[in-house]
């Protein structure tokens, strides 16, 4: 301490220190008394002691000051507010596939995605489009349209699609299914989905979905018309009842539908099917009183009734009277059930006929390409526009997309106890094997780290110590970790009574020690004959480790190595204060 006091009181030593270290040596002692006080000489060593501990306090004060100044720095930087430049996002391109009779741009005028992203509408028919789709580049659409006698050629990447036109019609020789495939290849979202648009390119395929609903709900809730499918003309021999309605291929607006009154006409139409080289369906003719149409646009429902005035069996041919009827729960069930097919239909309609005997028959379902009828056509178009904007807000804006839930973490299970974790056993009161007696034969065992025991379990074998009492000649008692009362009871029992429970507990509860076989563990209590008296005072964990290490070591070379280590530490400590 005298060396430290002289060294720390040296002015040259303080001058050579970096800035911020030991500033208290150069400050006057505030707690010292007046010069006339006789207690000054007695308190003279106190400034030295304070100066000795001043590096830690000065470092702590410097760190505290830095921590106090840290939150003030950002506030100072934030004082001059900088104007944030608004980020103008590019407008989203909406491709509406429809004819030129409806100008869809006016229905999207003023509408924005999430209220801040504009929508640019591009409208064209399937016949005016071409495209190229890429795996990573999306879909590039080429459009060539004629507006007011002017040909417009444009290329763009659409962000969303509204399909309002049929992609396939055999009657008009229109097949644009390849364009639907290209749009799907580019991963473009649409209303309705491109998956459903492609599936609606075959009416028998759609009718098969109605059959599933029919079997699910039953004929009372979902009255589906009886229909028969023929892949070609060969199986078309006769019909069970007449008159029948024959539908050839895939067509719209009543095209390809023929009413057959008798067997002779049926055979004639079979030859027409052979020339058409397509499939055909037959269904019983229903003498209808009126037609029913239930449409669904998003969450809006409407039901219409159409009655033929001209008397034609096709209600869409000639004169007809159309009126809106009440939306019943029966109609709602029909359209809701059909809207679930092909992954969901945002826009759909169900067509049915009401016979003169008062029964209903569902004959067809339509998708987003359905024609709009009635007095609320403008309202329906506005509903479609609102539905598209809602879908665009959900699918195109990253902030509106909801991520998928993360898989919850499973319950953490405790890992299996590795051999290296056996060192924690003494700290938890687990029994450990004692070392072999001095002078006895050493058992073959692998090198393992020193182990410690609790003070009540430690039994040491000092060098040259002889047995003191006959009780110490019994084998060491081993007990389970959760029975401290057993250790106290067995400590005062006879050797014979203590050896029996220890043998049973060691054979069932204690795992094998590293480097020892099971047979060696069973023979250990018999080979050990050297006494290990109890310690009369408790020891700290450091003393336990050192004494256990001494009992396991047994060679003087390790003592010399420890002494050499202590000497090296002393030299290192002395070099810190040397010149």
Curated annotation (Swiss-Prot):
Residues 399-530 are annotated as: J. GO terms for cellular component: extrinsic component of synaptic vesicle membrane; glutamatergic synapse; postsynaptic density; synapse; synaptic vesicle membrane. Keywords: ATP-binding, Calcium, Cytoplasmic vesicle, Membrane, Nucleotide-binding, Phosphoprotein, Synapse. The modification Phosphoserine is found at residues 9, 454, 461, 469, 474, 480, 483, 540. Residues 30-39, 47-66, 418-431, 453-485, 536-549 have a biased composition (Low complexity). Transmembrane segments: none annotated. Phosphorylation at Ser-9 dissociates synapsins from synaptic vesicles. Residues 531-579 are annotated as: E. Residues 550-566 have a biased composition (Basic and acidic residues). InterPro entries: ATP_grasp_subdomain_1, PreATP-grasp_dom_sf, Synapsin, Synapsin_ATP-bd_dom, Synapsin_CS, Synapsin_P_site, Synapsin_pre-ATP-grasp_dom. One of its GO terms (biological process) is synaptic vesicle cycle. Residues 1-28 are annotated as: A. It is found in: Cytoplasmic vesicle, Secretory vesicle, Synaptic vesicle membrane. It is a peripheral membrane protein. One of its GO terms (molecular function) is ATP binding. Residues 91-398 are annotated as: C. Residues 15-83, 401-566 are annotated as: Disordered. Residues 486-529 have a biased composition (Polar residues). Regulated by calcium. Calcium inhibits ATP binding to the C-domain. The A region binds phospholipids with a preference for negatively charged species. Interacts with CAPON. Belongs to the synapsin family. This is Synapsin-3. It comes from Mus musculus (Mouse). The lineage of its organism: Eukaryota, Metazoa, Chordata, Craniata, Vertebrata. The gene is Syn3.
